[in-house]
Amino acid sequence: MPHQQILMLFGLLPVATNISTWWNFGSMLLTCSALQIMTGFFLSMHYTANINLAFSSIVHVVRDVPHGWMMQNLHAIGASMFFICVYIHVARGLYYGSYLNKETWLSGTTLLIMLMATAFFGYVLPWGQMSFWAATVITNLLTAIPYLGTTMTTWLWGGFAINDPTLTRFFALHFILPFGIISLSSLHIMLLHAEGSSNPLGTNSDIDKIPFHPYHTYKDLFMISSMIMIMLLTISFIPDIFNDPENFSKANPLVTPQHIKPEWYFLFAYGILRSIPNKLGGALALAMSITILLTVPFTHTANTRSMTFRPFMQLMFWTLVTTFMIITWTATKPVEPPYTMISQVTSSLYFMFFMSNPIVGWLENKIMKTQL
């Protein structure tokens, strides 16, 4: 009986007929989340949060634990897939004006910040060379905060340098934060269904809706199956495509890698950080690169919701996507010309999108009135 009620609930859930494939990434994110929690749980059974044993425990999982190589690779590749889906999900929200559902957008941005924190803590856990140095560089940014910076850094490290207490608390945080993500995801979905999802036209779709099941459930299942297939193919043939070669060596505090860089999904924020020569300025720009998303619902001035009918904003949006990719690329390069200049120009363009959003909206309204 409860099973029938759940099916009936999905069957009665009205959804716009014209929502495209870009709306499937929410369910894909939910799948990624479930997969990460399951693989993470099994990996935590074999992991040892100790600076002398952490690296060896990962090697033990991959070599000795039955199907451990699959769990470890699923967890690592799953994180990359998670962020690919997240960035597409955010881009869809920006393009189609989903941010006008303010509560859903603000909870989603908070989710993104929590996800990035969780991924950062997880990257430190293998205690490889790049894990150690990336953690040192990023956590050291806290010292840029006036008055409180040094105290906060010492508190986070659990001492005067990154050591055993740091790894222990990072493991604890990496384990507990996903449960916070699940809770906030539930709130995110509830807030979304209070108003209902938007559609590519940005219009009210009350007059033309279909049941969620079977139409959108099968569509979701197809996209989820495709995503899992891509992940399994990656794990089978190119499992180390996203790994840094430096991270296959155990952490050595006495040897600094030639280029310190985090995982690829943080490179755009890291590129913005590096483009500013001042430490405090760089730390603020790093924080702003994500938190600026919180301003979008409050700077929308256009009469139309979606960018489907807004050619100027379409140009701005695709410029944003291009700058995102260029910043990611420059962050992998050494801090020298021409990369520093490219990084500074693209970082300026990145923030320009959010600052010019209200002006472009106002201009479009003026043009529309003139045409009428």
UniProtKB/Swiss-Prot annotation:
- What keywords is this UniProt entry annotated with? Electron transport, Heme, Iron, Membrane, Metal-binding, Mitochondrion, Mitochondrion inner membrane, Respiratory chain, Transmembrane, Transmembrane helix, Transport, Ubiquinone
Protein name from the UniProt record: Cytochrome b
Gene3D superfamilies hit by this protein: Cytochrome Bc1 Complex, Chain C
Instruction: Please list the GO terms describing molecular function.
Output: metal ion binding; ubiquinol-cytochrome-c reductase activity
What does this gene product do? Component of the ubiquinol-cytochrome c reductase complex (complex III or cytochrome b-c1 complex) that is part of the mitochondrial respiratory chain. The b-c1 complex mediates electron transfer from ubiquinol to cytochrome c. Contributes to the generation of a proton gradient across the mitochondrial membrane that is then used for ATP synthesis.
Protein's UniProt keywords contain Transport: yes
Q: What else is known?
A: Heme 1 (or BL or b562) is low-potential and absorbs at about 562 nm, and heme 2 (or BH or b566) is high-potential and absorbs at about 566 nm.
Query: Per the annotation, how and in what number is the cofactor bound?
Result: Binds 2 heme b groups non-covalently.
Q: Which Pfam families match?
A: Cytochrom_B_C (PF00032), Cytochrome_B (PF00033)
What does the entry list under GO cellular component?
mitochondrial inner membrane; respiratory chain complex III
Domain of life, per UniProt, equals Eukaryota
Asked if the Swiss-Prot or TrEMBL record annotates the protein with the keyword Electron transport, the reply is: yes
Q: Which positions bind a ubiquinone? A: 193
Q: List positions binding heme b b562.
A: 75, 174
One GO BP annotation of this record: mitochondrial electron transport, ubiquinol to cytochrome c
Q: Where in the cell is it found?
A: Mitochondrion inner membrane
Q: Which family does it belong to?
A: Belongs to the cytochrome b family.
Q: Which organism is it from?
A: Acrantophis dumerili
The cross-references to InterPro entries, in alphabetical order and at most eight, read: Cyt_b/b6_C (IPR005798), Cyt_b/b6_C_sf (IPR036150), Cyt_b/b6_N (IPR005797), Cytb/b6-like_sf (IPR027387), Cytochrome_b (IPR030689), Cytochrome_b_C_euk/bac (IPR048260), Cytochrome_b_N_euk/bac (IPR048259), Di-haem_cyt_TM (IPR016174)
What are the TM regions of this chain, as residue ranges? 25-45, 69-90, 105-125, 170-190, 218-238, 280-300, 312-332, 339-358
Give the record's membrane topology. Multi-pass membrane protein
Query: At which positions is heme b b566 bound?
Result: 89, 188
According to the record's subunit comment, the protein's assembly and interactions are: The cytochrome bc1 complex contains 3 respiratory subunits (MT-CYB, CYC1 and UQCRFS1), 2 core proteins (UQCRC1 and UQCRC2) and probably 6 low-molecular weight proteins.
What this protein needs as a cofactor is: heme b
